[in-house]
C-alpha cells in the first residue's frame, strides 16, 4: 500500500462516527447493565387541556444509559414488533428508521387525537411518520377518555439524532427539551464508562 493510501485510510478512521451505543469520549461501545436512567428521563412531553403526548426515542445509543429493567422493557418491545417494524421500513425503502414510543393521554372526556399530526424537526427538516404501529386497540379509535392512554411505535425516515438536538411537534405544541437533556446524557455516559471499568455487572438487578 502506498503512503498516500495509508494516509487516506488513517484520515477515514479519524473521521468515522462512533458506532451505535458508543460513548463519544471512550470511542468504544458502552456495556449494558450499568445505566440508571428511566424512561421519564428520556421523555419529551407536549400537551394542552385535551391531551398530553409523551415521546421516548428508542435508539440503541440510549439503551446502555437506562436502568436494567427499563432497557429490558424497551428491547422486548422492539423485539416483539420487529416483523412489523421491518415491514414498514422495507415498504418505505429505509434501512435504519428512527423509532419513537409515543403515548397519548386523555385529559378530558372524548379527547380526540390525530396520529399523523406528530412530527419531529431534524436539522430544519420536518419528518412525518413513515408508519405507525399501534400497541393498543384504543389507539385505532383515536379517541380517549379522562386518564385513558393509547400508545404506538412511530417510524421515521432518519435515525433520531439523540446526541444532538431535535424538536417534537404536535400541531402548535412544540418541545425543544431534548437539547436540555444532552448534559444529563453526557454525564450518564461518563458514569457508565467509569462503573464498567470498576464494577461487575449485577445480574440480579
Model regions: which residues?
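Conserved functional micro-motifs across diverse proteins
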Residues: 20-205
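Bacterial N-terminal signal peptides
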Residues: 6-16
Amino acid at each position: 500500500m502506498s503512503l498516500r493510501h495509508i494516509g487516506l485510510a488513517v484520515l477515514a478512521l479519524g473521521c468515522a462516527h462512533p458506532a451505535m451505543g458508543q460513548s463519544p469520549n471512550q470511542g468504544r461501545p458502552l456495556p449494558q447493565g450499568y445505566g440508571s436512567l428511566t424512561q421519564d428521563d428520556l421523555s419529551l412531553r407536549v400537551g394542552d387541556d385535551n391531551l398530553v403526548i409523551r415521546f421516548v426515542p428508542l435508539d440503541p445509543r440510549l439503551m446502555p444509559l437506562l436502568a436494567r429493567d427499563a432497557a429490558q422493557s424497551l428491547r422486548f418491545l422492539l423485539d416483539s414488533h420487529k416483523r412489523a417494524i421491518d415491514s414498514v421500513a422495507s415498504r418505505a425503502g429505509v434501512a435504519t428508521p428512527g423509532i419513537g414510543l409515543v403515548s397519548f393521554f386523555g385529559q378530558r372526556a372524548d379527547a380526540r387525537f390525530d396520529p399523523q399530526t406528530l412530527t419531529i424537526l431534524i436539522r430544519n427538516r420536518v419528518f412525518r411518520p413513515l408508519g405507525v404501529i399501534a400497541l393498543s386497540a384504543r389507539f385505532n379509535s383515536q379517541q380517549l377518555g379522562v386518564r385513558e392512554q393509547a400508545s404506538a411505535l412511530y417510524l421515521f425516515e432518519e435515525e433520531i439524532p439523540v446526541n444532538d438536538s431535535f424538536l417534537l411537534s404536535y400541531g402548535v405544541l412544540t418541545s425543544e427539551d431534548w437539547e436540555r437533556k444532552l448534559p444529563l446524557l453526557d454525564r450518564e455516559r461518563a458514569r457508565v464508562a467509569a462503573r464498567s471499568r470498576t464494577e461487575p455487572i449485577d445480574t440480579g438487578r
